[in-house]
């Protein structure tokens, strides 16, 4: 059976072949293990790695890193510059926002405080940076997923999971409660997920419900302070990398880096 922590270390090892450790903020799992729908021996472990750009790359106006590593077992690691990560946070992409809450990650000790201060400390605010954008983003993702393969059990399961998410998000529930279904709902999702072929009526009904939800709007709010804070997080992370390279002895970490939880 696939061990999630072992997979994280394997993904990190591949990222380290491309970037030095001081440029890697962390490697974070995303997907079924964060929703409670991970099935041992069946589900893949996919990750996102956050890279800090150097001052030289900024001066040369290098394009922010955005690439993927594909593994033979079907898993993949998405590598992104922290500027791109923050951009996806602001776009309210659920696949990126969930890394703020995952229990499965390798967090570079050199960036642990920075990650906590600029991102994790305000994660509930970040996930509601633009609630209307988040709402429409999830609806669009759900409809696209269901239309791709309307009889596939995994897609139907994802559809119901996203419907549950929207219902909880609308009620203002904590984000972790939004992305992790109750035990009762989880049992239903897993049942659907294990089915290879289902009636297309499930997808049809779900799409109709999502289409109806498109009209809903949250009250607008001022997010300028949070926007500035996130931008400061980008700036400070780049300055921090520069400080690490100027005085590496101050940031030396003895021993193997542990898998950490972002809480």
What are these regions (language model features)?
Residues 26-29, 50, 98-99, 168-171:
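A structural signal for short, well-ordered beta-strand segments and their strand-loop junctions
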Residues 31-72, 159:
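Catalytic metal-binding acidic patch
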Residues 204-252:
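Low-complexity intrinsically disordered segments
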Residues 60, 171-172:
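Short conserved micro-motifs at the rims of enzyme active sites and ligand-binding pockets
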Residues 65-170, 177-197, 202, 255-263:
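Conserved NTP/Mg2+-binding pocket subregion across the NTase superfamily
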Residues 1-10, 190, 214-221, 254:
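N-terminal regions immediately upstream of nucleotidyltransferase
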Residues 22, 40-42, 154:
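A generic fold-level signal
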